[in-house]
Amino acid sequence: MVTIRLARGGAKKRPFYQVVVTDSRNARDGRFIERVGFFNPIASGQAEALRLDLDRIEHWVGLGATVSDRVHALIKDAKKAA
């Protein structure tokens, strides 16, 4: 099953997440099909905290991809801000 979820990057104690489309059987930070955005939970000042390609996310959801709870909340925030 294809899912849209967060893949962790960044350094120790400084997380940075890529929003990726992947097979649910793959490891959290493993192989993915497409990168559709990023989330920086510790962004400050002028740094961009969230960027999502909503068109591509809607495309994948239309094809039957499931969305993780956290990514669903991020999509909701992005739509509210836009």
UniProtKB/Swiss-Prot annotation:
Please give an example of a GO cellular component term from this record.
cytoplasm
GO molecular function annotation: structural constituent of ribosome
SUPFAM superfamilies per record: Ribosomal protein S16 (SSF54565)
Reply yes or no: does the keyword S-adenosyl-L-methionine apply: no
Q: Which residues cross the membrane?
A: none
Q: Name one GO biological process term.
A: translation
In its keyword annotation, does this UniProt entry include Cell inner membrane? no
Q: Which UniProt keywords apply?
A: Ribonucleoprotein, Ribosomal protein
Family designation: Belongs to the bacterial ribosomal protein bS16 family.
What's the name of the protein? Answer: Small ribosomal subunit protein bS16
Q: Which organism is it from?
A: Serratia proteamaculans (strain 568)
